[in-house]
Curated annotation (Swiss-Prot):
Compartments reported by the entry: Cytoplasm
Protein's name according to its UniProt entry: Peptide chain release factor 1
Species: Borrelia hermsii (strain HS1 / DAH)
Entry's family note: Belongs to the prokaryotic/mitochondrial release factor family.
Organism placement in taxonomy: Bacteria, Pseudomonadati, Spirochaetota, Spirochaetia, Spirochaetales
Keywords: Cytoplasm, Methylation, Protein biosynthesis
Length: 357
């Protein structure tokens, strides 16, 4: 029965209430914040559960009246009330199911986005720069803060790769479905014959990780320093300020050269490394849980083609949500809300199917 799934909630709330009264908990701010968040989440479910039970009670009362009432006009009024209550019941039940979905603990975190040019040479690098601008413009609209961490620029101003940080409310929740291969179809500025070309760039959205979230053993790291280089490969610094860190157990390599000081470059590289290792561990856990089963709307795999940007047709097609929007110019200027909200709804619907109550 639907309500049976909700029965343990009140006892969990009582346990958390007792935990919050412990003065020692306040000393551990991280654990305290986590407990408050869980308590508020369960309180939301309890409020909806109470509302649901109240509606069921009203339905039962009206059904009893209907079975006993002889006046036809009164019966019709009761039937109308029952129809309204049943609609309300379905609505509240759906809201409870959404609340019961797995809560992503990373949703409230800041993020690091990595964009890499894929197939398509210079045109792919220019598209990678376009994607960077799209996300930074969207961040401006959302009043989020962005900070460039590292980039490798081409002579025409494209990005072979770029890493940047976005800070703000629910950043990961909003942008987490952007990981994957973004494909572009357009006539490149380098193409003299005006032929349409298909290029691609890969986007990775990583939740920002604190030192306490993942443990990195210094013995597992190889750190190399070298001179920074600019577009075309020329050296832009006379000192060995650029840093490359290799995590030996996983083979993950991170490099950073955009800060003038070696120390700052190392800090930025470690920030990216923590995020990548955290993602690496999460992907392993997901594979174990799902036994390699991928959601129908997309796995979030970086190798998965998720979206096509067709410039001649002013069209953006998202292959997971199966929608095409003829507003490419607006989307490239950071008008992403409709697209992102549609995607979130698609993933939500799939989760409800996978976790049917």
């Amino acid at each position: 029965m639907f309500l049976e799934k909700l029965s343990p909630i009140e006892s969990k709330i009582k346990i958390l209430e007792e935990k919050l009264q412990d003065i020692n908990l306040v000393k551990n701010q991280k654990e305290y914040a986590k407990t408050v968040k869980e308590y508020n989440y369960l309180e939301k479910i309890k409020a909806k559960k109470d509302e649901y039970e109240n509606i069921l009670s009203q339905i039962n009362e009206n059904q009893k009246i209907l079975s006993e009432e002889e006046n036809l006009e009164m019966k019709e009024l009761v039937k109308q009330e029952l129809a309204h209550l049943n609609l309300k019941k379905d609505e509240v039940e759906h809201m409870i199911k959404i609340l019961l979905l797995h809560q992503d603990e990373n949703d409230s975190k800041n993020i690091i986005i990595e964009i890499r040019a894929g197939t398509g040479g210079e045109e792919a690098a220019l598209f990678a720069h376009n994607l960077y601008e799209m996300y930074t413009k969207y961040s401006e609209k959302k009043k989020w803060k962005t900070e460039l961490i590292n980039f490798n620029e081409t002579e025409l101003g494209g990005f072979k790769e770029v890493s940047f940080e976005i800070k703000g409310k629910d950043v990961f929740k909003k942008l987490k479905h952007e990981s994957g291969v973004h494909r572009v179809q357009r006539v490149p500025i380098t193409e003299s014959n005006g032929r349409l070309q298909t290029s691609a760039a890969t986007v990775a959205v990583l939740p920002e990780v604190e030192d306490t979230d993942i443990e990195i053993n210094e013995k597992d790291l190889r750190i190399d320093v070298y001179r920074s280089s600019g577009a075309g490969g020329q050296h832009v610094n006379t000192t060995d300020s650029a840093v490359r860190i290799t995590h030996l157990p996983t083979g993950i390599v991170v490099q950073c050269q955009n800060e003038r000081s070696q120390h700052k470059n190392k800090d930025q590289a470690m920030k990216i490394l923590r995020a990548r290792l955290y993602e690496f561990e999460n992907l392993k856990k997901q594979e174990q849980r799902s036994n390699d089963r991928k959601q129908q709307v997309g796995s979030g795999d970086r190798s998965e083609r998720i979206r096509t940007y067709n410039f001649p047709q002013n069209r953006v097609t998202d292959h997971r949500a199966n929608i095409s929007l003829y507003k490419l110019e607006e989307i490239m200027q950071g008008e992403l809300d409709f697209l992102l909200d549609t995607l979130a709804l698609k993933f939500q619907e799939q989760s409800l199917k996978d976790n049917s109550i």
